């Protein structure tokens, strides 16, 4: 009797899951000893788990850029330093096995899923990274210390994983800017790659916290992306910074159930608010609460100078005539 061929094991395609620093070092060393091509690189995607298609887009991009024999590491760590009093640290969704299966299909080689005592062996760190003034406005104003906590763990994970490339979503625009500044200001030898926001078909930006929304709240939350799209259209038509903000604010204010923390049009390299006469690239940012869920979103816009009023040249010429 012929024994049927055993189908390929899904387990064989799973990434190596490591929980300790020693296990991570072994995984890094094993890849180095495997003789990767000189064009292959090590890439890292840092997450807090509860992965969705937005995270998987980061992993797929990391797989593509690392090269066929490169090493893609996904970190899954709910960082307590990023949560303030009364925030959802205890209830933040966690599903390690489900997350591992998802990143396996996206091309991850290693999952580093440490516990807080592994990342912070001495408890809360005495020395932390400061986001400076970037961490004092917008998200920093509403979540004091959040960006400092994010930068501290990012720097630690960069040291632990030693990547050539690190991938971050553009949905967390202020955090991405802070990471870029930290890497540049502190001479960290890594290339930071921003990946565009992934949205559901209805426009809602993917977020692990979307799971908290009821069906009605989810429909209400669509006002965020709708306001950003409308603001971008006004910017492209020459409406000016004030009109961009007024249009976006009007949509948010008209939607019952949306409580806005901030709506701002900022310089994408500094997060400073742009002046009323600004033209050129800008970033339209919003943070709002729908029910008990806090959501953020943003849209890159190009503020076009308003068109010159018709007839101005003729009028000027007539006034100059004797």
Question: In which residue ranges do the predicted regions lie?
Answer:
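Nucleotidyltransferase catalytic core that binds NTPs
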Residues: 2-258, 264-266, 270, 299-300, ...
């Amino acid at each position: 009797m012929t024994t049927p061929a055993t189908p390929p094991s899904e387990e064989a395609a799973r990434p190596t899951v490591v929980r300790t620093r020693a296990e991570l070092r072994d995984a890094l060393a094993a890849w180095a000893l495997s003789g990767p091509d000189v064009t292959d690189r090590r890439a890292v995607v840092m997450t807090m788990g509860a992965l969705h298609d937005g995270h998987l887009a980061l992993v797929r991009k990391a797989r593509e850029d690392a090269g066929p024999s490169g090493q893609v590491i996904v970190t899954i760590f709910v960082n307590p330093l990023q949560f303030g009093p009364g925030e959802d640290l205890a209830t933040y969704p966690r599903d390690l096995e489900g997350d591992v299966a998802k990143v396996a299909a996206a091309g991850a080689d290693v999952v580093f899923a440490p516990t807080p005592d592994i990342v912070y062996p001495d408890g809360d760190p005495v020395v932390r990274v400061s986001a400076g003034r970037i961490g004092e406005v917008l998200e920093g104003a509403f979540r004091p210390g959040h960006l400092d906590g994010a930068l501290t763990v990012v720097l630690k994970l960069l040291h632990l994983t030693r990547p050539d490339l690190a991938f971050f979503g553009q949905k967390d625009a202020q955090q991405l800017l802070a990471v870029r500044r930290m890497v540049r200001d502190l001479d960290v030898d890594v290339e930071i790659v921003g990946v565009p926001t992934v949205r559901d078909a209805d426009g809602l930006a993917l977020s692990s916290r979307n799971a908290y929304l009821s069906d009605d709240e989810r429909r209400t939350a669509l006002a965020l992306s709708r306001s950003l799209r409308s603001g971008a259209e006004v910017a492209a038509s020459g409406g000016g910074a004030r009109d961009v903000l007024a249009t976006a604010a009007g949509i948010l204010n008209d939607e019952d159930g949306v409580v806005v923390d901030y709506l701002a049009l900022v310089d994408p390299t500094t997060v400073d608010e742009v002046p009323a006469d600004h033209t050129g690239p800008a970033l339209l940012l919003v943070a709002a609460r729908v029910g008990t869920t806090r959501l953020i979103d943003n849209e890159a816009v190009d503020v076009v100078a308003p068109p010159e009023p018709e007839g101005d040249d003729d009028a000027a010429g007539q006034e100059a005539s004797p």
